[in-house]
Amino acid sequence: MVYNNINHVKEKSFVHSTFWYENMNGSQYIADKLAEELHICYDTDIKNIKYAHNKWLIEEEYFDKVIFCGNIKDMVKIVEGFDIREYEDEIVKLEYHGTTAVFCEIDKNPYSWIYQPSKQHESHRIICTGNFAKSNNGNCVPEGRITATIEFTDEISKEDIIDNLSRISLHPKYLAHKYNPYTYPIQNVHTRD
């Protein structure tokens, strides 16, 4: 998957048809391997990114490359010295679907992802994270159970989450949840220009 992305190899089947997940530390393993021998600053609140002298200046330190992992709408406000104003109107108009991700414990099963369109509940997908790596389950998950993330489109209250979980198979037990309003940009004919 990483090779295909770097070398622009087109997927010949559906988007998740090729899948790799490391047994220890999950997808974090990939990030850690890519980060080896690089100077990476994590957990830093960046208020300004300036392009000067063919380098990126951030918090009084110069960098050759910057990977922006924030909301693209914020990028327009904080980047200086690199003209992205021609895209500003389109970026401001960009719409998103948010996702409420619910961390749960569920019955052990053989699946990685379960897409579950149903009129019985509002969830659209279960990601069986406990099946990707045993270390994802930790020592607290009882025998016959695994961890999972159950996703709901847009924001949903804890009360509604609990109510929905009671109608989903695999007997999900609520552990925690987090809402991200900027999960999926809504594409249109102009957003890929």
PLM feature spans:
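Flavin (FAD/FMN) cofactor-binding core of flavoprotein oxidoreductases
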Residues: 160-193
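Residue-level signal for pocket-adjacent positions within structured domains
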Residues: 14-16, 41, 86-89, 109-111, ...
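Short, glycine/charged-rich beta-strand-loop motifs at protein surfaces that mediate ligand recognition
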Residues: 23, 151-154, 179-185
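Helical element adjacent to the flavin cofactor pocket in flavoenzyme catalytic cores
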Residues: 3-65, 69
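A generic structural-conservation signal
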Residues: 42-44, 100, 174
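Secondary-structure boundary/capping positions in well-ordered alpha/beta enzyme cores
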Residues: 38-41, 82, 172
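Mid-domain catalytic core of redox enzymes
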Residues: 47-164, 168
